[in-house]
Swiss-Prot record:
GO MF terms, alphabetically ordered: guanyl-nucleotide exchange factor activity
Organism name: Homo sapiens
Keyword Endoplasmic reticulum tagged: no
Role summary: May act as a guanine nucleotide exchange factor (GEF).
Protein name: Rho guanine nucleotide exchange factor 37
PROSITE patterns the UniProt entry points to: BAR, DH_2, SH3
Lineage, top ranks: Eukaryota, Metazoa, Chordata, Craniata, Vertebrata
Gene name, Swiss-Prot/TrEMBL: ARHGEF37
Keywords associated with the record: Guanine-nucleotide releasing factor, Repeat, SH3 domain
Length: 675
């Protein structure tokens, strides 16, 4: 009895220990089952992804490639990440004691990669659903898609594509639950417990970040669309709310410019925007240069010298024509096609990809003004309306998205530009190689193929030099040998205009247009044949002596020098006698007459006024055509021979030297003093 009484307390104390061990065993069993569930479901999940990426996507080739890219998004990247993730999970099966801790470490290791790939897929999920709804409106297409899905994944049922597309979203949200289940069956004092806690928290953060990213993309998607609206459509969108919003923003901006309120500074974003604008400028410049290159290439291909008949039956010219024909029909056309497909089209796509970020940056500035106004009100009042809070969140979402993605975008654009430039250089190198290969056969038949390259270069330079000298001599000959001047009749009603030009510039500056002139530049004149002009300068601003600056009496501009000839306006003796008389009729200017017959009576030289001149100051004297004058000095006080000091009717003054002429007049019989 005593012995039995001694054993009874020990049996009661052993019962709790057995219950504790049994509880630990149950927790360990549940823990292992949770780990097994994680691995098994990961295997099934990865298999389903592979079916979508391989079997289903390959059978939906009748859909546009753009639709397939939206439907399956970056599913290939998800498969790559989850394949490595599953491999590491399966490796832990051989280490049962450390398996739970290893699982937690694996989740921590893949945290960033999982977030990067799944946030892209989740952000495009709504667009994929819109496409699925569009397909449902086309019964024949919907039946075709449904048949493919049911053949590959029978358990999809009537949901079809929607059942498959939602699987990645369900999986990323289930990871924290699976980890939480493992954590609940882990004793707190175990070494794996804190690791699992960090893993659960990390996966919850991943889902939170994905939701925030998705929200930012939804906000940004409203402003990245480039709409081509007409003026009427833009005006139709204007309402009182729009006017009020834009007026408030303008007021906020003016206050900042005036220094009344501070401007929000964001050095990080400003640096990223500056970098983006520089990258955009590089893309634009390269696109313009490639466009000009393609235009020049097209002009080069339009010129086909091999199609011209040179009337040369044989020799190097025929060989060159054969080579040129071969290059034009094959090498150059293929080069142009490759250039358009591998350089021009990617460059246009790159330029188009810049439009979305550009619109987003512009919209961020508008939202920044709204944000600053709301912040001011929040400091003053302490509360804001729901719409103001939404505007505040919109700016924060846009700013966070740009700061997060602009660095990657700028880097990708620069890499794309580098690849385009490398492709362009490679195409040029391939073209040069093809031309050399095709020319080798023809070069062997040319007369100087055995000459070394330096000597051949010298030979070509000498030949080109001789040809250039010949062309230059021909040009000089044609410039020197001009047709004899012909007298062009004055245009009707131009006498007064000619008189004005004479009184202003003198006869030595007057020229007549020999043929119609059609101006092509902004400063070129269009003049009819026979027009009288005054030369202002015998060259243009670039020093080209082939273009003269002239004055028509109303307009000034440039005309070709080769279409002008000096206009001689010396009046005849009969006209001089008539002008010297009492006849006050208007005087007509005529070209220089042929030499008069020798008079039968003695004559003497007399200086007369060839043209009328009106004095413009007290230092000048007026003249009448045919009026005799006395030259006192053949130059002015500065020695300028263009002005002469004369005496007329007892008055002295300066007149243009070009307005004076010597005329022969009969002398009276008798003695005369020598002049």
């Amino acid at each position: 009895m005593a012995k039995h009484g001694a054993d009874e307390p020990s049996s009661r104390s052993g019962s709790p220990d057995r219950e504790g061990r049994a509880s630990e065993d149950r927790s360990l069993l549940h823990q292992r089952l949770a780990v097994r569930e994680l691995i098994d479901t990961e295997v099934s999940y990865l298999h389903m992804l592979q079916l979508c990426a391989s079997d289903i996507r390959s059978r939906l080739q009748q859909l546009p490639q753009g639709d397939l890219d939206v439907l399956f998004s970056n599913i290939d990247d998800i498969i790559k990440v989850n394949s490595r993730f599953l491999h590491d999970l399966q490796e832990t099966a051989s280490k049962e004691e450390e398996q739970v801790q290893l699982v937690g470490n694996i989740f921590l290791e893949f945290q960033e990669e999982l977030e990067q790939v799944y946030k892209v897929y989740c952000a495009s999920y709504d667009q994929a659903l819109l496409l699925v709804d569009t397909y449902r409106k086309e019964p024949e297409l919907q039946r075709h898609i449904q048949g493919i899905v049911e053949a590959v994944v029978p358990q999809a049922g009537s949901s079809g594509l929607s059942f498959l597309l939602v699987i990645p979203l369900q999986r990323i949200t289930r990871y924290p639950l699976l980890l939480q289940k493992i954590l609940e069956n882990t004793v707190p004092d175990a070494s794996a417990y804190p690791v699992l806690q960090r893993a659960v928290s990390a996966l919850q953060d991943v889902n939170t970040n994905i939701n925030e990213y998705k929200m930012r993309k939804e906000v940004a998607s409203k402003y990245t669309k480039v709409e081509q609206l007409t003026l009427r459509e833009r005006l139709a969108r204007i309402n009182t709310h729009t006017l009020s919003k834009k007026t408030t923003r303008l007021s906020q901006l003016l206050k900042q410019e005036a220094g009344l309120i501070p401007r929000t500074e964001d050095k990080e974003f400003d640096d990223l925007e500056e970098r983006f604008q520089w990258v955009s400028l590089c893309v634009t410049e390269l696109k313009n240069n490639v466009a000009a290159y393609l235009d020049n290439l097209q002009a080069f291909l339009y010129f086909r010298p091999h199609e011209y008949n040179l009337d040369i039956p044989e020799g190097p010219a025929v060989q060159y024509c054969n080579l040129a024909r071969d290059l034009h029909l094959e090498a150059f056309l293929k080069f142009k096609q490759r250039l358009e497909g591998l350089v021009w089209q990617p460059l246009c796509s790159l330029a188009k990809a810049l439009l979305g970020p550009q619109n987003l940056i512009k919209k961020r500035l508008d939202k920044l003004l709204d944000f600053e106004r709301v912040e001011e009100k929040l400091l003053e009042v302490g509360s804001v309306t729901y719409q103001e809070e939404a505007a505040r969140h919109t700016y924060q979402a846009l700013n966070s998205l740009l700061v997060a993605e602009l660095p990657q975008f700028n880097q990708l654009v620069m890499q794309w530009l580098g690849q385009i430039m490398c492709t362009f250089v490679t195409l040029q190198r391939d073209l040069a190689k093809q031309v050399l290969q095709r020319a080798e056969g023809s070069m062997a038949q040319l007369p100087h193929h055995h000459v070394p390259e330096p000597a051949f270069r010298k030979l070509v330079e000498d030949a080109l030099g001789r040809t250039s000298n010949q062309l230059r001599s021909f040009q000089e000959t044609f410039e020197k040998v001009q047709p004899p001047p012909t007298t062009q009749p004055l245009l009707p009603g131009s006498e007064r205009q000619v008189q004005a030009l004479l009184s202003r510039y003198g006869p030595g500056k007057l020229y007549q247009v020999t043929s119609n002139i059609s101006g092509t530049g902004t400063l070129d004149l269009t003049l009819p044949r026979g027009q009288i002009v005054a030369i202002l300068q015998n060259k243009d601003t670039k020093g080209n002596s082939g273009r003269w600056l002239v004055d028509t009496g109303g307009h000034r501009g440039y005309v070709p020098a080769g279409k002008l000839q000096l206009y001689h306006v010396v009046p005849s003796a009969e006209e001089l006698r008539r002008q010297a008389g009492l006849n006050k009729d208007p005087r007509c200017l005529t070209p220089e007459p042929s030499p008069a017959l020798v008079p039968s009576i003695p004559t003497m030289n007399q200086v007369i006024a060839a043209y009328p001149f009106v004095a413009r100051s007290s230092h000048e004297v007026s003249l009448q055509a045919g009026q005799p004058v006395t030259i006192l000095e053949a130059q002015d006080k500065k020695g300028n021979p263009e002005w002469s000091l004369v005496e007329v009717n007892g008055q002295r003054g300066y007149v243009p030297s070009g307005f004076l002429a010597r005329a022969r007049s009969p002398v009276l019989w008798g003695w005369s003093l020598p002049s």
